[in-house]
């Protein structure tokens, strides 16, 4: 029995609320159970210096956690004067994931910056950030098109992410903190809406796990991503 009472192949209660911020070109509050991440997309009509003149755009991301998003307060990284390795890893992952489904030539020389702020953390913050950021990115690009500054569809597919793990030897979908902190193995899967693999991050926490167990995790992830993509579509439909 999972701590939450969920079936092994069940996601947490997922809510993707688009248009959450009135200022950003695109935004989405992604709620994966008790994990809440605000994702905003901002359009900058310039690209990094190393890309100028190349005729291509760029999509990048920043990630951060509010001091009391966790059980005990954590100092802001700005107060420490540097980002942690974990923060840098996660924001690079978010950027890579979104670029994998964006036709950078079609958007022209603009940069879209995704800001992912964890309001409350209960496991799976990076997966919530990726899933919500895609919704925010889509919104921003749609608004860009309406202004006559670009042409859709620069997004080639959906992208979403979910975690899976082995808890007491059983493969389970979408780990919360209680499961993630005790899992024998866990993995984050970033997949496209058509089933393409963008990135898989997997770790054995106690002892190696078998290939057959990994395939169980992958099958769960594929099921979860299918459901998340359906929620992304529903979120965008609610804006029309």
Swiss-Prot record:
Transmembrane segments: none annotated. One of its GO terms (molecular function) is tRNA binding. GO terms for biological process: rRNA catabolic process; rRNA processing; tRNA processing. It is an enzyme of class 2 (transferase). The keyword Translocase does not apply. Keywords: Nucleotidyltransferase, RNA-binding, rRNA processing, Transferase, tRNA processing, tRNA-binding. Phosphate binds at residues 86, 124-126. Gene3D superfamilies: GHMP Kinase, N-terminal domain (3.30.230.70). It catalyses: tRNA(n+1) + phosphate = tRNA(n) + a ribonucleoside 5'-diphosphate. Its EC number is 2.7.7.56. InterPro entries: ExoRNase_PH_dom1 (IPR001247), ExoRNase_PH_dom2 (IPR015847), ExoRNase_PH_dom2_sf (IPR036345), PNPase/RNase_PH_dom_sf (IPR027408), Ribosomal_Su5_D2-typ_SF (IPR020568), RNase_PH (IPR050080), RNase_PH_bac-type (IPR002381), RNase_PH_CS (IPR018336). Phosphorolytic 3'-5' exoribonuclease that plays an important role in tRNA 3'-end maturation. Removes nucleotide residues following the 3'-CCA terminus of tRNAs; can also add nucleotides to the ends of RNA molecules by using nucleoside diphosphates as substrates, but this may not be physiologically important. Probably plays a role in initiation of 16S rRNA degradation (leading to ribosome degradation) during starvation. Belongs to the RNase PH family. Homohexameric ring arranged as a trimer of dimers. This is Ribonuclease PH. It comes from Rhodospirillum rubrum (strain ATCC 11170 / ATH 1.1.1 / DSM 467 / LMG 4362 / NCIMB 8255 / S1). The lineage of its organism: Bacteria, Pseudomonadati, Pseudomonadota, Alphaproteobacteria, Rhodospirillales.
């Amino acid at each position: 029995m999972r701590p939450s009472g969920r079936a092994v192949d069940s996601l947490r209660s997922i809510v993707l609320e688009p248009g959450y911020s009135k200022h950003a070109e695109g935004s989405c509050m992604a709620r994966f159970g008790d994990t809440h991440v605000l994702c905003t997309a901002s359009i900058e009509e310039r690209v990094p210096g190393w890309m100028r003149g190349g005729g291509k755009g760029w999509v990048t991301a920043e990630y951060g956690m509010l001091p009391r998003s966790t059980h005990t307060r954590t100092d802001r990284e700005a107060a420490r004067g540097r980002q942690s390795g974990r923060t840098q890893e996660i924001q690079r992952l978010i950027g890579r994931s979104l670029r994998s489904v964006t036709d950078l030539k079609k958007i022209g020389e603009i940069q879209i910056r995704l800001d992912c702020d964890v309001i409350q953390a209960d496991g799976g913050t990076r997966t919530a950030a990726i899933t919500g950021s895609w919704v925010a990115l889509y919104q921003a690009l749609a608004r860009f098109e309406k202004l006559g500054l670009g042409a859709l569809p620069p997004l080639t597919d959906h992208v979403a992410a979910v975690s899976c793990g082995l808890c007491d030897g059983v493969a389970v979908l979408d780990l919360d903190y209680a499961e993630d902190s005790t899992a024998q193995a866990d993995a984050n899967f970033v997949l496209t809406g058509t089933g393409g693999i963008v990135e898989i991050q997997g770790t054995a926490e106690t002892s190696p796990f078998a290939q057959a167990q990994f395939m169980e995790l992958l099958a769960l992830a594929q099921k979860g991503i299918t459901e998340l993509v359906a929620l992304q579509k529903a979120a965008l439909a609610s804006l029309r």
